[in-house]
């Protein structure tokens, strides 16, 4: 009996030890499972964050791509590759952006007016980027839509001003514009400005002066416009431009009207295409290829 009791006691101790060991194994397994669950939860959280970040990046990339498409479409609309053929006039134009692939508010227009007249406009919206480009596109469309109904530059500028204010209200995002019209049967040039640099005679760089410079479009109903006109001789030429031309910066000064006159003065009776080409080259050299503002040129010469 004593031996059986000892054996039973020993087996009981061994069984207890085995149970304790199993309990420890179970406890360690539970700890491992808890750690594994914690790790899985953390990894899932991190994956969710990464997925959110990746989705946000994809959305930003898609938005940037859509904006680039819009910018290019608007740029092509503001600066079409070809100008229309107009009675009695040769035309040429150019647009030089300050930053590659960026569209500013500069635009030009050569359009048909009444009685075979031609309407020429160069405009500049304050600012850069998509908002300025859209405002410029709207302004250009307003001029293009009204050009067939008048060869009066003051009236055309006023109509564009009304359209801008009706669309967006009075705003600080103003538009400057110069408008020149040409009636070939009378060889009559008419011009007016809404806060825009004066046009220049193509052969000597002198300004086409108006009694007043007018107020920029979009900032109020009263532009204070006045028109000037002149009967031109055959071959007379004019240049409209945005202020990116004269305000281009060199090493220690701006290109200025003096730079424009010097460039044109080196040519003898230049065609519009020649005048635009020499001005593009000269101002790019002057600014070392780094324009600080976009630049728009529109030249015309009567036949």
Predicted regions: what they are:
Residues 11-14, 42, 156, 188, ...:
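Acidic/proline-rich low-complexity IDRs
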Residues 46, 52-237, 289-303:
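… and, occasionally, acidic/histidine-rich disordered N-termini of signaling adaptors
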């Amino acid at each position: 009996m004593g031996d059986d009791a000892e054996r039973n006691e020993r087996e009981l101790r061994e069984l207890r030890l085995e149970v304790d060991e199993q309990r420890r194994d179970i406890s360690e397994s539970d700890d491992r499972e808890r750690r594994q669950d914690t790790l899985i939860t953390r990894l899932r959280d991190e994956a969710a964050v990464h997925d959110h970040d990746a989705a946000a990046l994809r959305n930003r990339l898609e938005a940037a791509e859509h904006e680039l498409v819009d910018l290019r479409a608007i740029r092509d609309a503001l600066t079409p590759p070809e100008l229309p053929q107009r009675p009695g006039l040769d035309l040429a134009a150019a647009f030089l952006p300050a930053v590659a692939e960026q569209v500013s508010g500069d635009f030009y227009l050569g359009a048909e007016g009444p009685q075979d007249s031609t309407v020429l406009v160069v405009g500049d919206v304050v600012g850069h980027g998509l908002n300025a480009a859209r405002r410029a596109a709207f302004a250009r469309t307003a001029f293009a839509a009204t050009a067939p109904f008048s060869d009066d530059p003051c009236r055309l500028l006023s109509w564009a001003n009304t359209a801008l204010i009706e669309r967006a209200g009075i705003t600080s995002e103003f538009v400057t514009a110069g408008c020149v019209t040409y009636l070939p049967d009378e060889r009559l040039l008419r011009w007016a400005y809404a806060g825009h640099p004066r046009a220049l005679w193509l052969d000597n760089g002198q300004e086409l002066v108006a009694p007043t410079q007018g107020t920029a479009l979009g900032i109020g109903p009263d532009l204070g416009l006045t028109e000037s006109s002149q009967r031109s001789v055959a071959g007379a030429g004019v240049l409209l431009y945005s202020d990116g031309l004269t305000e281009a910066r060199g090493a220690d000064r701006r290109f200025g009207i003096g730079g424009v006159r010097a460039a044109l003065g080196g040519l003898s009776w230049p065609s519009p295409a020649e005048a635009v080409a020499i001005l593009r080259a000269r101002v790019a050299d002057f600014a070392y290829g780094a324009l600080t503002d976009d630049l728009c040129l529109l030249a015309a010469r009567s036949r």
